[in-house]
């Protein structure tokens, strides 16, 4: 359950401009510790840009982003990873020259909680077991299926023991069986109290996993509330879901 008295992440009036294009405009929200927050909206609404701002891949034009009170806006991706934010990507990003175990271990070396040697190997192997790849450690990541590469990317993000986990369309491109497995994996993280922001188009996942949702359209927040509340909102239906999905 979200912690009512602990704010993990605070986004205050964040704007990101690319020349004359405003990708995110005056966006504000708070993420409670142990909360799973859904960030939804149509393509091009600014969701992934917001994830890039939080993770340090982009610098805000204005506004502030605080992780447990520490200003992290624009300090850079490596420093933000060290401070405790880990992510997956819309398109899976593997380290192609490394094995599965080595990919996961990279998260433990460069992230928030650092491990080395046998401790790191054992921890990475335990994470592979957790995501359903107990025997894949020595396999080249390029030999894996798409869903298994996603599992590795999730394990690598978890290897840093992040304070906040960002999942950017982690369920995209999965078939129905893979989708069921993927939702179950994220549900395990939710049950154990992870603090997560999910960008997702799979509404079943949003309904079942998220405590609260923020809906973006054209770079601005148009709705905020529980999944049930925002998915019934008329403006959200017009902007994103369509009448058939109401």
Where on the chain are the PLM-derived regions?
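Glycine-rich phosphate-binding loops of nucleotide-dependent enzymes
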Residues: 2-246
